[in-house]
Design a protein with these regions (language model features):
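Cysteine-nucleophile amide-bond enzymes
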Residues: 1-181
Length: 181
């Protein structure tokens, strides 16, 4: 995989054909389903929010066996740095494993991307969406989500404010999108 094509500030989306619970909720760019995303920092590093570890900086090469979509936005060097600095301010936050809005010191992957780009204009940079837990194929909320939220004494937050890598991959702010080969 040619990681040399990545530029600072690129949003990197990951496909995992074996993941069903997140990927089954919608379809993203190119008809693919993305279960994860992060921001490329340069020098082979990615900032991302991952289960069990929260917001971390890691090597993008760990995804070399996955299909990767690169989404690029034409921004000034200053704005790209502002996005990266903001993202780095979230290092150490816990993972928002319930995907609920406004969780103190917790973020999930696409929420991290939204928050980092928010810093450019101090307002939503990407289109806002609501959470959808209906499976595309089954048109019902799967038992996985019902049981997950019930375990924490919550209702499934269908329709609450939130984001998803698939919806984000379709945002019209991206000027250039390509699969990394």
């Amino acid at each position: 995989m040619n990681f040399q094509k990545l530029r600072k500030g690129d949003v990197v989306f990951i496909v995992d054909d074996n993941e069903e619970n997140i990927s089954s909720l919608s379809v993203g760019y190119g008809g693919l389903s993305y279960y994860h995303c992060g921001i490329y920092l340069g020098d082979g590093k990615l900032i991302e929010a991952v289960k069990y570890h929260g917001v971390i900086e890691d090597d993008v090469s760990k995804y070399s066996i996955k299909k990767i979509l690169v989404a690029r936005i034409k921004l000034t060097v200053e704005d790209i740095q502002k996005v990266i600095d903001t993202a780095k301010n979230f290092l150490g936050y816990d993972y928002n494993d319930l995907f609920l809005p406004n969780q103190l010191n917790k973020l999930y992957c696409s929420e991290l991307v939204h928050q980092a780009f928010f810093s450019i204009e101090n307002q939503d940079f990407f289109t806002s969406h609501t959470l959808n837990y209906f499976s595309v194929a089954k048109n019902t909320i799967s038992d996985f989500w019902i049981q997950l939220y019930a375990k924490h004494s919550y209702e499934v937050p269908q329709g609450e404010n939130g984001s998803h890598p698939n919806n984000l991959s379709l945002d019209n702010k991206f000027d250039q999108l390509f699969i990394l080969l």
